Amino acid sequence: MTREHALKNAIAYFDDGHFLDDLKRRVAIKTESQIYESRKADMTEYMDEMIKTFQELGYETEVFENPNSKAGPIFFGSRHENSNNKTVLTYGHGDVIRGQEERWEPDLVPWELKVKNNKIYGRGTADNKGQHTVNIGALKSILETRGCLGFNSKILIETGEESGSPGLADFARQQKELLASDVLISSDGPRLQPERPTLFLSLIHI
């Protein structure tokens, strides 16, 4: 199987509506970390969504309690294929800012995915549920094409980024070996131009 086959599978994931179906399901979960105490059940639901999704892709999964008792759980997934392979750690966050329903247009609801004027609306579509849904789709397309990734994959999805990532630094220190990798891909950050993807090749103090 070739790179072209993998790209064809990835494009089909978007064109056949499966991407929107997956994203719709995730957007509907109200993971507002700024009011975490009232959203604990939603955070658990999102962790369950990640567990199911990644186990279907052959990952071992685990949900960790946050070292900060006032912050949400942390999801970790791992797919180890070969000790000689490089390991890629991918970061994302499942939490969103508050819905702020009163600030949305009358025909839009933050927890309901809607395509309008060729744009996708819903809380988390741009930050960050959309991004890690894209990443999941890419991993799936590779696995469907050749049955393996060709690298070892680790996934970290926190639920407190919109509140300053409480507990994440402590978690990283405690789980240094678990998170050890050769490459970090963090699909979260600013975009310099709306119509053009922005790629940062190196960052310090991560």
Predicted regions, residues:
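Acidic/His- and Gly-rich active-site-bordering loop/insert found
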Residues: 2-123, 142-151
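Acidic/histidine-rich catalytic neighborhood of metal-dependent amide-processing enzymes
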Residues: 128-202
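Conserved small/polar residues in nucleotide/adenosyl-binding loops
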Residues: 204-206
